[in-house]
Design a protein with these regions (language model features):
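Extracytoplasmic small-molecule ligand-binding "clamshell" domains
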Residues: 1, 16, 21, 42-121, ...
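A bilobed periplasmic-binding-protein/Venus flytrap-type ligand-binding module shared by bacterial periplasmic
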Residues: 1-4, 134-146, 209
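Ligand-binding clefts/hinges and TM-proximal coupling segments of bilobed small-molecule sensing domains
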Residues: 5-43, 161-183
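Conserved functional loop/turn residues at catalytic and ligand-binding sites
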Residues: 106, 154, 195
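Ligand-binding "clamshell"
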Residues: 117-132, 172-174, 209-210
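Short Pro/Gly-enriched coil loops immediately N-terminal to beta-strands
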Residues: 123-137, 149, 184
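Flexible hinge/capping segments at coil-to-helix
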Residues: 127, 138-155, 169-170
Length: 210
């Protein structure tokens, strides 16, 4: 249900958090004051919801040294919890395994960074709440300045959505190989070390890493 987000959008809370963590307001959720009043049955207070989140996607969601989670999604989830009178438990999942995690009962819902690449027939998807594109990033001193110059080269990605973006652009047939990395920090470390020639990332977080 997105009524909670629509109410928070009307309050300006989502825009505030987006600007705080991403430097820009990327939100696209409809604003609807008093949206929760439209529910036929009001939420039962005291419920615990297990949310599947990605780790290593700073500043969207990433674990801290003490084991807690920080970032845009945890802060927004806390605001939703306050609206509903619920508590949340975060479960780290791989974004490519959302349907399996939901089907097994390990999580009640998944809150991803920006996009979902699986079949929409196996899960119920909410409308997008962040405007996002994928970007191809190279080192500042790289000699690769055009897409065509990456022919036969190594591209680093972190998940299937980045691979889908690569395929949509037609570059998957041109590059030499595509390597998966655990998270964006590992992806950029590989780029800096020269282990890959470019990386594909969500545009909403590109400013954080560059």
């Amino acid at each position: 249900n997105t009524l909670e987000l629509k109410e928070l959008s009307a309050d300006g809370q989502i825009s505030r958090l987006s600007a705080q963590y991403l430097g820009t307001d990327y939100t696209c959720m409809e604003a609807l004051p008093g949206a929760l009043q439209l529910l036929e049955t009001q939420p039962e207070p005291g419920r615990k919801l297990r949310i599947g989140v990605q780790d290593g996607i700073a500043p969207i969601s990433s674990s801290r040294d003490d084991g807690s989670f920080g970032g845009l999604i945890p802060d927004l989830a806390q605001l939703v919890a306050e609206k509903l009178g619920w508590t949340f438990e975060y479960m780290v999942i791989n974004s490519d395994n959302v349907a399996a995690e939901l089907g097994s009962g390990n999580i009640d819902c998944a809150w991803m960074a920006a996009s979902f690449s699986g079949s929409s027939s196996s899960v119920s998807l909410s409308p997008g709440w962040l405007r996002n594109t994928h970007e191809l990033v190279v080192r500042s001193d790289s000699r690769y300045t055009r897409k065509n110059s990456l022919k036969g080269k190594v591209i680093g990605i972190t998940d299937a959505t980045a691979l889908a973006a690569l395929k949509e652009s037609g570059m998957d047939a041109k590059v030499g190989s595509v390597w998966y990395y655990d998270d964006l920090s590992a992806c950029f470390a590989a780029l800096a070390a020269g282990d890959c020639d470019a990386v594909v990332i969500d545009g909403i977080v590109s400013g954080y890493y560059m």
